Amino acid sequence: MQTFAEISALREQIKTFKREGRRIAFVPTMGNLHEGHLTLVRKAREHADIVVVSIFVNPMQFDRADDLNNYPRTLEDDLSKLNGEAVELVFTPTPEMIYPEGLDKQTLVEVPGLSTMLEGASRPGHFRGVATVVTKLFNIVQPDVACFGEKDFQQLAIIRKMTTDLAMDIEIIGVPTVREMDGLAMSSRNGLLTIDERQRAPVLARTMRWISSAIRGGRDDFASIIEDASDQLRAAGLHPDEIFIRDARTLQVVNAESTQAVILMSAFLGKARLIDNQVVELVKDSKEEVDSAESESENSH
């Protein structure tokens, strides 16, 4: 396994592999790797000869300084895990390398619509930061395929559209969420939880499953479902951030044409902001316009 901090050195090595006809897969991460990340690496291995993993805590996508400062950084442990997966190349740039003129003078990439709705509405600039850094990393690595977790459902939709809109010749592969034994979605932020908080955290997934069951049972009173779900989270000591029920394909309000809905949830627990999602098939009676859906976020606080 080779580790590169310099863009030019990484590019030269990738060019060598490409001249040899090797297929390149890329897994961008922010480090503090867990089994979910390693699942992405294994999926990447299925689609390419060479796997490149980046470890970069991107300051542009954080809307709170404390969140950026608290984000766990475990480089030595990360490199050990990647070595165990026989990753060929690891890219570990500094913010100064990625943004040499600073954030204020950086050319920005933003996917209209998708970037400013749902989570993007409450975290202005977040998805612009994601799209910008992923574009830069794609340009540096020049992969044939890139793997992203489905846990970040809206982010994956944005990256898919960005790749299509900018005519990037990169196959985007979504990988299902990896969960702990108790159902909690694996996340680097889980390490911020205290022992007591960790015991309460699976309530997010359980509440999501309750919402899914309600929808599959034919309920279409989404505002009431969201209110009940928020109460369940509060009762367990979580602070609801956002709960949305949207069309899984468009992320717009569910309507008569919708065949699947996606439940998008986030909640604060201690220092951690936990997120999760689940796609659910809609029964016929649920495929109608839900006028109250636009106020879901506000109702979930």
From Swiss-Prot:
It catalyses: (R)-pantoate + beta-alanine + ATP = (R)-pantothenate + AMP + diphosphate + H(+). ATP binds at residues 30-37, 149-152, 178, 186-189. It comes from the Bacteria. The active site is at 37 (proton donor). GO terms for molecular function: ATP binding; pantoate-beta-alanine ligase activity. Pathway: Cofactor biosynthesis; (R)-pantothenate biosynthesis; (R)-pantothenate from (R)-pantoate and beta-alanine: step 1/1. Its EC number is 6.3.2.1. The keyword Metal-binding does not apply. NCBIfam families: cyt_tran_rel, panC. Homodimer. This is Pantothenate synthetase. It comes from Vibrio vulnificus (strain CMCP6).
